[in-house]
From Swiss-Prot:
Residues 32-51 have a biased composition (Gly residues). Forms a heterodimer with timeless (TIM); the complex then translocates into the nucleus. This is Period circadian protein. The run of Gly-Thr is implicated in the maintenance of circadian period at different temperatures. Deletion of the repeat leads to a shortening of the courtship song cycle period, and thus could be important for determining features of species-specific mating behavior. Residues 9-31 have a biased composition (Low complexity). The lineage of its organism: Eukaryota, Metazoa, Ecdysozoa, Arthropoda, Hexapoda. Residues 1-66 are annotated as: Disordered.
């Protein structure tokens, strides 16, 4: 489960190396909890990665501007 999550998040890692750890953590939490059968944790974690995948791009742009 963890390795699968990191693999999918690998696509986002190319966008920003710093946010890689944060994205992988959220994705692992989502897949891990869902795999465990915790629908409550799965739904919560799942929402994080999806919405979180977009903000990193804006954050990277701000860093580039600096």
């Amino acid at each position: 489960e963890g390795s699968g999550g990191s693999g999918s998040s690998g696509n986002f890692t190319t966008g920003s190396n710093i946010h890689m750890s944060s994205v992988t953590n959220t994705s692992n939490a989502g897949t891990g909890t869902s795999g465990t059968g915790n629908s409550g944790g799965g739904s919560g974690g799942g929402t994080g990665p999806g919405s979180g995948a977009i903000p990193p791009v804006t954050l990277t742009e701000s860093l580039l501007n600096k």
